[in-house]
Amino acid sequence: MNLPAKLGARGLGVVIFAIALASGARAQVLNSGARTITLQAVLSDSITVSLSSNAVNFNLTAGNASNPGSTSVTATTSWALKPSVGSLKLYAFFSSSTAALTDGAGNNIPSADFQISNNAGPFNALTNTVPFGGANAGLQLSSTPILGNNRTGSRNDVMNLNINLAPLPSLPAATYTGTLTIQAQAI
């Protein structure tokens, strides 16, 4: 027996209607025009420096070369830099080489007698001209080459501070104050 005879006229009509309905459903798909969204994500270049302490005290001994600070200071430098940057440098500086610390009455401790040991290295006086601060009143603490794998990163520099009073044997007793600044530069 063939299919039309098995289904009968009514069954055959139902099958034909179902096929027509299914093919008609596909023919009724309607899509809108495509619309786009423009995306822009900006990661700005940045450098930040944070310090573990913003105050260090010294108990000075007249004429003594070793007058260490009360605490070390850790400078944490963090960055996100553009591909054109080749290095990141960290500097310490005073605004004046002749009066890094002063008693306000004309007696001064020059930057040449203020010393920093960075990351357990030797003590160095602040006698260089750096991009910031006064002439002959700075010190480059570190230089980090910026390569493809460290365009974003951070580093710590642990600074021990000392005031050398050996060159100042007649410095009068007083309270001496000053401001040491730490700043980074990407080049």
What are these regions (language model features)?
Residues 22-24:
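N-terminal signal peptide c-region/cleavage motif recognized by signal peptidases
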Residues 27-122, 128, 138-187:
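N-terminal small/polar-rich segments of proteins
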Residues 13-20:
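Bacterial N-terminal signal peptides
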Residues 2-13:
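Bacterial N-terminal signal peptides that target proteins for export
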